[in-house]
Amino acid sequence: MEKAFDQYEVWFVTGAQLLYGGDAVIAVDAHSNEMVNGLNESGKLPVKVVYKGTANSSKEVEAVFKAANNDEKCIGVITWMHTFSPAKMWIHGLQQLKKPLLHLHTQFNKEIPWDTMDMDFMNLNQSAHGDREFGHICTRMRIRRKVVVGYWKDEDTQHKIAVWMRVCAGWADSQDMLIIRFGDQMNNVAVTDGDKVEAEQRMGYHVDYCPASELMKYHKNIKDTDVEALVATYFNEYDHDASLEDKSTEAYQKVWNAAKAELALRAILKAKGAKGFTTNFDDLGQTDGSYFDQIPGLASQRLMAEGYGFGAEGDWKSAALYRTVWVMNQGLSKGCSFLEDYTLNFDGANSAILQSHMLEVCPLIAASKPRLEVHFLGIGIRKSQTARLVFTSKVGSGCTATVVDLGNRFRLIVNDVECIESKPLPKLPVASALWIPMPNFEVGAGAWILAGGTHHSCFSYDLTAEYWEDYAEIAGIEMIRIDKDTTISNFKKELRMNEVYYMLNKALC
């Protein structure tokens, strides 16, 4: 088991009925226990599975689902029908269930015992029958769920369950997520705006405004000794020129000020219980010497690495989404980051998009140890020498995602990408990645634009489109995927069909 999710558990509920007698009930319970123990011992699942018994009646189903709703440790429910389990007995429980649902279509035994199977065996082991009945009632009731089909001991089956578990963890985390905005969105920018009320209804997280002046109160109270200790941590953790440690230089003072800004941000985030934040480079408080003298880019980079959601220019949707990406990514090795489409490189089949930001790119995606540097930044209200971590990203496949508000719904846009090696950028000392959107630059970028995608996105080497499909299913939002098989013609058709579906779906639900 992975320690990252020790605070959570997923409940396993088996469906059966009393028609087949007491011996069958005992066998179902024994098989279910063995399966749950086997899943937990496989080492493939990031969240502990807890067997909650066999449901043989409507009252039992309703009781266990209500209990799941009220248990903070429970982040999802797996159901499996060992025998035939008449689906009417699941109606009231499914009406109550608020936690994510996975329907596992499997069987205790892997193969049919051809020479010995009798009617008793067939009655006991009829998931092929029971799971279809359960699937029907879920579909009739418009219950959103993930269906996993496969033998429970197979790695592919366990992987699909593990993906869903990670998404459930991200979803559970977002249900008490607070994002605070220091300042507002960047003026006149459309895509970073949206309906915060609908976002909280759909995705759980809450967004509050926080004036930069409140952050400055925390900034004033930071002790110099704490700042000096953090500066020493910087020098220990990151490559840097030895001259940067010269306390008589402006560069050292900028690093010192960046450390003070980080401590202030940490203090206010902790005090408010926030899991993410946004900044606006045009709103950083007063400008005298006791206040921020630079964009808190270094602080944002380090806080992202520790799991705080971040969105630039007031982009609260990206801040919340990055936090969810980071949670789902826990225990996986390659890293994730907030990124922005910046500059295009037309190079035939290798045409690519440079991903960067002014400063705020997470070091979890760095190909090698980040380098601490200080350079002039001429953007925003603080045009000054500014500390930052400089690096390039790893080479490899990944997936980037964004959420946009289309007025009548949220759309999750997902694009498979391939990070490639970047050429040196001696005049651009920032963190960056260079990627080719799938299936190629022309189609990938074109589809993203047609879908209304943002210039900000949340990227991971470890998460795949399957994670995002599960997330969209749980949230009840639209998902559009751009991958190796995408064509512009078919993509346009999908967008048009989805437009009609979501307009009609509001009337059906």
UniProtKB/Swiss-Prot annotation:
EC number per UniProt: 5.3.1.4
Gene3D superfamilies the record matches: 3.40.50.10940
GO molecular function: L-arabinose isomerase activity; manganese ion binding
Claim: Manganese is one of the keywords in the record: yes
Binding annotation for Mn(2+): E313, E340, H357, H456
Pathway: Carbohydrate degradation; L-arabinose degradation via L-ribulose; D-xylulose 5-phosphate from L-arabinose (bacterial route): step 1/3
PANTHER family: L-ARABINOSE ISOMERASE
Similarity comment: Belongs to the arabinose isomerase family.
Role played: Catalyzes the conversion of L-arabinose to L-ribulose.
Listed cofactors: Mn(2+)
GO cellular component: cytosol
Name of the gene: araA
Protein name stated in the entry: L-arabinose isomerase
Co-factor: note: Binds 1 Mn(2+) ion per subunit.
Gene Ontology biological process terms, A to Z: L-arabinose catabolic process to xylulose 5-phosphate
InterPro entries the record matches: Ara_Isoase_C, AraA_central, AraA_N, AraA_N_sf, Fuc/Ara_isomerase_C, Fucose_isomerase_N/cen_sf, Lara_isomerase
One Pfam family from the record: AraA_N
Reactions performed catalytically: beta-L-arabinopyranose = L-ribulose
Keyword entries, A-Z: Arabinose catabolism, Carbohydrate metabolism, Isomerase, Manganese, Metal-binding
Membrane-spanning ranges: none
